[in-house]
């Protein structure tokens, strides 16, 4: 059993990564959860008594996914203010969370049953760098087959423009340009031709479905 201290610590760890990724709203939210969580709700008790390894199990993401679902559904105005950054003081965030856990306990608890699927186009930058290395060694024509493609955003990689420290790859008129933080010399950009992209997932998501 992980123990309460370790389970709270998972939210501190998530807060650290949120700060590193310039996501201060989520960082404040995670810190408030870690500090203010109690057993006064079934959801709170389930998190504090989590029997698995909370970081590996993505416990913070499971709970925050549930909170975000409430915001998207328009179910709680104060929580929406936390997510938008209008409410940004730790004590105020803890107060909102305590009430939300009481008012929406039944809606939040099922979100702990499984980790959320996260879709972030920026992850395609690392994939493209790998594809460039393959193209340089084996030639430009590549096929992508992704296992666990979720909403399929990586499968749109041939439609994104990438800027790697000033070295560009992808359509110049692409509607999305991904510019990761780059240190050092820009990479070589060999010819690359992605001729097909395919993916599979046990629970595929439709990203156009709000």
Regions found by a protein language model. Give the residues of each.
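Short, well-ordered alpha-helical packing segments
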Residues: 128-132
């Amino acid at each position: 059993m992980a123990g309460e201290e370790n389970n709270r610590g998972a939210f501190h760890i998530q807060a650290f990564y949120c700060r590193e990724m310039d996501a201060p709203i989520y960082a404040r939210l995670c810190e408030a959860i870690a500090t203010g969580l109690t057993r006064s709700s079934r959801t709170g008790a389930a998190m504090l008594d989590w029997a698995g390894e909370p970081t590996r199990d993505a416990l913070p993401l499971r709970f925050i996914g549930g909170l975000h679902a409430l915001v998207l559904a328009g179910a709680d105005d104060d929580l929406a203010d936390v997510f938008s950054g209008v409410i940004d003081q730790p004590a105020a965030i803890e107060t909102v969370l305590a009430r939300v856990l009481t008012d929406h306990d039944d809606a939040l608890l099922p979100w702990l049953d499984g980790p959320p699927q996260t879709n972030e186009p920026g992850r395609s930058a690392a994939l493209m760098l790998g594809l460039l290395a393959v193209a340089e060694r084996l030639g430009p024509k590549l096929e992508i087959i992704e296992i666990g493609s979720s909403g399929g955003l990586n499968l749109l990689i041939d439609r994104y423009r990438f800027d790697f420290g000033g070295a560009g790859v992808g359509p110049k008129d692409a509607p999305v340009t991904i510019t990761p933080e780059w240190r050092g010399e820009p990479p070589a950009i060999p010819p690359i031709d992605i001729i097909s992209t395919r993916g599979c997932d046990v629970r595929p998501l439709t990203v156009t479905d709000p």
